[in-house]
């Protein structure tokens, strides 16, 4: 049975459910920025269910229930200390996340899991499905910011976290923390620690078979100031360029930087090749001059763009344009599984590509709709907001 792939559409719902509705090898490029870990509470509209069993009649309980009534190792994931460091601005107890007593499913916001290992596992589930729907010639571009432990974020409770430092998320029972004491104690969850969440996610994707081609530094030229006094201000984020096969579409010439040459009168003509002499390190030879421009490298300095609509973080359109210019073939389908305010979809729309978004929050879907409407000359009649799918359901990929 041939399954028609939706195009120029926003699918509203759980990202895993919507991805599993898509057929294999149907997307050319994935451009996305996932929720960052432990930084922001987006409200009850962003709550979803992860892990556990789909047919379970869930019996939800809070962390406090698990802590006071005991639930094996789940007790550890529920424990937060009442002790607080002086000088740290702790928020009120956030994230009314819950656990199912029957199947250990977890109900909460992606990015507000009680332990970073659970967050990484949830993202790994998503990107395994993305790997299935991505064409062999396709690519994944993932932006993810980092988090400091014990600061002003939602999870700034160092003492409570120290009990989790040796807990390991295991696949024996979905959603449960299985206690596995390490011979050497790992104390990486300490106050003021930069958690390296993007790197940990990237390694998890490599374990799935993804091929990491570049870690690009997105230098935010007009980055936000910070009030910290004992470290440097953050001015960049990671942008990972992944592929699923060693033969993939990539057009470097489309994003080359023009040569900055200003030859006035009396200047010698520049040769397209230049010889270099033999040294102790090199055997000598020639280096080529590409008339189309220079390789832009892996540090991209781009200015953040303001957004009138209510959304906390949005891609710069120039960043998405550069990505699609080098990685999207003519007539390609662009997917953003965490569409947010829809910047990647909007840029794809402007550039004449087909696009597909997935977004959990209805009000963000409305924002996307309004932004696309402003540029409706291309293909507005193809836009629809889909809250349900009649596409043949695909089983999740297991590796």
Question: Which role does the model predict for each range below?
Answer:
Residues 1-247, 254-255, 261-399:
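S-adenosyl-L-methionine-dependent nucleic acid methyltransferase catalytic domains
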